[in-house]
Amino acid sequence: MEHKDNSTMYGTTILCIRRGNKVIIAGDGQVSLGHTVIKNSAKKIKRLANDTVITGFAGATADAFTLFERLESKLEKHPGQLLRACVELAKDWRMDRYLRRLEAMMIVADKSVSLIISGNGDVLEPENGIAAIGSGGNYALAAAKALCESNDQFSQNMTLEYIITTAMKIASEICIYTNNNIIMEKIED
């Protein structure tokens, strides 16, 4: 994520892992303004649609809250249809002159699907049930994939909470815009 100026808040790590009937989204708590840490305990994960959807954002905070509100209204118009609501949001985000300027990405999940939504109009379902966004996203993604795809006996017995916490901790040790104050939300069927 490019840091254009010191007046915009950037940098975070959001990680989503789905296994079986459980999905967890985790985010770190750091908010940076330029090269300065402003807050260590921000909550970047939110529940929507009567707690049936969880979402996390990376990017400018005010922009993300605008997108949360828009997504919530799309979910009200299309209850129980997360994919359709996300596609409608992405279309608006790409076409609307005001929304096009928003600088954020989102991971959204319900009991059956996980999606990444970008301002380019992309709605992507990740492979292998693992998705990550933000400045530390690639580190968290690599760590989560390594933990999930290992074939040894230990990895098969790891809980999703352990995997996501470990992957986020690894990302926080590499990315200067990510801390180890991890907040998680989960949906379990």
Swiss-Prot record:
Record's keyword annotation contains Protease: yes
Keyword field: Allosteric enzyme, Cytoplasm, Hydrolase, Metal-binding, Protease, Sodium, Threonine protease
Localisation per UniProt entry: Cytoplasm
Enzyme class, first EC level, given as a word: hydrolase
Catalytic activity: ATP-dependent cleavage of peptide bonds with broad specificity
PROSITE patterns, per database record: PROTEASOME_BETA_2
Family of the protein in this entry: Belongs to the peptidase T1B family. HslV subfamily.
Name this protein carries in UniProt: ATP-dependent protease subunit HslV
Species of provenance: Ehrlichia chaffeensis (strain ATCC CRL-10679 / Arkansas)
